[in-house]
């Protein structure tokens, strides 16, 4: 081990730790980092360390592959329309069971195994996330759009030393349960908390001018420059909704949004605590 190199890395991280200490950061946990056991350990380690240095951390997760896997066991086909899962009554039962009962609790357990304190929540708890059925366009069943975020439970959890781990399920005024897109849920929570940062873990390095060439990664992106990337067809496909979430979050008061590659070991620490970072920062 090169002790000088280790000391140098730790020393260089100091101004970033000071910058984020006491600030709120909301992380969307998903992609390969949620499926690969080794990557999962890297991310959980990062989350616990971030909490230990004084960051007010909130984790939001989906779990699409786990839902699809369970539906397959029930011989029920997963149907997607414009990237959103068609959610009938039976599918909603599975979504709630898998996200809140399995994925959420596994994450809480893992965080605690690394020495962190975590509290598993879903939007139904304390009517934290309110939603209504998406009424425009094609009928998606019990897929909702968020109408309100009650931050009281989230803030109370943070103040008591916990990492709130939130599954993207919401409660309607009609007392129905709604499936919420996890990216959208993350940015809505970040906006409601007026978070310092929103971080989306993905399976791509970030926003790139050429998706086949990692050297074309755009490391910093101003809000005013995004329109040109839309027009040049650089932002397209699966990146579109993620960028839209980042833009809306910043317009709502979040200081910066980051799209990073969850397949990179310790991606969160490298993005936040180094000068170069590893992904795209939008501000």
Swiss-Prot record:
Keyword line: Amino-acid biosynthesis, Arginine biosynthesis, ATP-binding, Cytoplasm, Kinase, Nucleotide-binding, Transferase
Primary residence: cytoplasm
CDD domains per the UniProt record, alphabetical: AAK_NAGK-C (cd04250)
Pfam family of the protein (one): AA_kinase
Reactions that this protein is recorded to catalyse: N-acetyl-L-glutamate + ATP = N-acetyl-L-glutamyl 5-phosphate + ADP
Entry's localization field: Cytoplasm
One GO biological process term: arginine biosynthetic process via ornithine
Pathways per UniProt: Amino-acid biosynthesis; L-arginine biosynthesis; N(2)-acetyl-L-ornithine from L-glutamate: step 2/4
GO MF term list: acetylglutamate kinase activity; ATP binding
Transmembrane segments: none
Top-level taxon in the UniProt lineage: Bacteria
Family to which the UniProt record says this protein belongs: Belongs to the acetylglutamate kinase family. ArgB subfamily.
Role: Catalyzes the ATP-dependent phosphorylation of N-acetyl-L-glutamate.
Stated name of the protein: Acetylglutamate kinase
Gene name of this polypeptide: argB
